[in-house]
């Protein structure tokens, strides 16, 4: 028998989350962002759940080709564009939309002699200060892009740095408006946070990422309460051993947790080699949450490579084989991430290849029914 750990990708949740994004931006088209192998969920695994999107946004040419091989005929956006001149042959072959964010990319386009209309999203740096033309240089870049014979539609694009925080988007929105004033073309500005909370920035296209997977842009699960978003991934396992410990016993490497009263603990088949955060605390009053048989408890001691230990005080009926949820249905991934000093994005992307993954089909009536292996 294999280890009992598995991840479940919830197709119905993905489809639900796409509809939530549409309800928040009803007059916009949606780029469902599937970069980083769909935030660790797997492009092939999320495709059915997200295929009602208007387009997919991603980074790698390989990921774009995989989408085409799955049968996707709609728009595919390269969020960082192309990296070498030879990439443009693939852009044309697979009818990809490319971001253009710097002088070097613009020059490669001018020299490429593109055959057919290639759609471009021209990026403005309005304050994120990673990618994009400076606002003062944007109009000239747009004029050059428009003059390239193989360039088709040009969409104005930027990315918000503080849509999930108190500074907000006003300063960047104003810079965007100044840079694009009088220029024709559609606009794409909104990430997940702006899609949820800044309707004035929705424009023609929104680009939701982490909310597609049911997590919060702020990293705080409570901030998306009431939205209807659902977790797209559950990491599940079982208890593989139980220990009854007396005061003075210590738990795990480094003996970080010392038992102060008679205590029953469970050993879970999950560790940092599975993608669980090694730095998740389980001592000194700082405890990372976990569900045992649906009851919220917490880890005790250090996370090991293959195991974690959990407090069973609130689960007296627990035994070997009792189900455990590390995150997902009933336990927001953001709660685990926040306790561990990181964000849900990182935990999603860190799911280890050795963890078996099951896909719950989109048509499944009840969450938790397992579908095909993937």
From Swiss-Prot:
Catalytic class of the enzyme: isomerase
Domain of life: Bacteria
InterPro entries: Ala_racemase (IPR000821), Ala_racemase/Decarboxylase_C (IPR009006), Ala_racemase_C (IPR011079), Ala_racemase_N (IPR001608), Ala_racemase_pyridoxalP-BS (IPR020622), PLP-binding_barrel (IPR029066)
Keyword annotations: Isomerase, Pyridoxal phosphate
Keyword Isomerase carried by entry: yes
A GO cellular-component term linked to this record: cytosol
Reactions the enzyme catalyzes: L-alanine = D-alanine
Keyword Isomerase: yes
Annotated active site: 35, 253
Pathway as given in its UniProt record: Amino-acid biosynthesis; D-alanine biosynthesis; D-alanine from L-alanine: step 1/1
Molecular-function GO terms, alphabetical: alanine racemase activity; pyridoxal phosphate binding
Required cofactor(s): pyridoxal 5'-phosphate
Binding-site residues for substrate, renumbered to this chain: 130, 305
EC number(s) recorded for this UniProt protein: 5.1.1.1
Regions crossing the membrane: none
Alphabetized Gene3D superfamilies for the sequence: Alanine racemase, Lyase, Ornithine Decarboxylase, Chain A, domain 1
Residue(s) carrying N6-(pyridoxal phosphate)lysine: 35
Reported function: Catalyzes the interconversion of L-alanine and D-alanine. May also act on other amino acids.
Family: Belongs to the alanine racemase family.
Name of this protein: Alanine racemase
């Amino acid at each position: 028998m294999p280890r009992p750990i598995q991840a479940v990708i919830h197709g119905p949740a993905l489809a639900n989350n796409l509809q939530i994004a549409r309800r928040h931006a009803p007059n916009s088209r949606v780029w469902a962002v599937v970069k980083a192998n769909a935030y660790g969920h797997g492009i092939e695994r999320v495709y059915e759940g997200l295929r009602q999107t208007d387009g997919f946004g991603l980074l790698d040419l390989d990921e774009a080709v995989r989408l085409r091989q799955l049968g996707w005929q709609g728009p595919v956006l390269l969020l960082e564009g192309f990296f070498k001149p030879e990439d443009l042959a693939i852009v044309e072959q697979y009818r990809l939309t490319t971001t253009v964010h710097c002088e070097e990319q613009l020059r490669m386009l001018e020299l490429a002699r593109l055959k057919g209309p290639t759609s471009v999203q021209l990026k403005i740096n309005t304050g994120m200060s990673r990618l994009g033309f400076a606002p003062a240089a944007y109009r000239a870049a747009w004029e050059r892009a428009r003059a390239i014979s193989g360039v088709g539609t040009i969409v104005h694009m930027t990315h918000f740095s503080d849509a999930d925080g108190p500074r907000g988007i006003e300063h960047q929105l104003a810079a965007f408006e100044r840079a694009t004033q009088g220029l024709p073309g559609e606009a794409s500005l909104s990430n997940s946070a702006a899609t949820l909370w800044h309707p004035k920035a929705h424009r023609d296209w929104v680009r939701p990422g982490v909310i597609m997977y049911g997590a919060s842009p702020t990293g705080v699960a409570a901030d998306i309460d009431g939205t209807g978003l659902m977790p797209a991934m559950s990491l599940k396992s079982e208890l593989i051993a139980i220990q009854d410990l007396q005061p003075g016993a210590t738990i795990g490497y480094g003996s970080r947790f010392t038992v102060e009263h008679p205590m029953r603990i469970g050993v879970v088949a999950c560790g940092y080699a599975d993608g669980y955060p090694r730095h998740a605390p389980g001592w000194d009053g700082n405890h990372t949450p976990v569900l045992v048989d649906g009851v919220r408890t917490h880890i005790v001691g250090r996370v090991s490579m293959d195991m974690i230990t959990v407090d069973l005080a609130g689960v007296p009926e627990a035994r070997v084989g009792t189900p455990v949820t590390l995150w997902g249905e009933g336990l927001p991934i953001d709660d685990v991430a926040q306790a561990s000093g990181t964000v849900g994005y990182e935990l999603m992307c860190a799911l280890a290849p050795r963890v078996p993954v099951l896909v719950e089909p989109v048509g499944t009536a009840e969450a938790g029914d397992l579908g095909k292996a993937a």
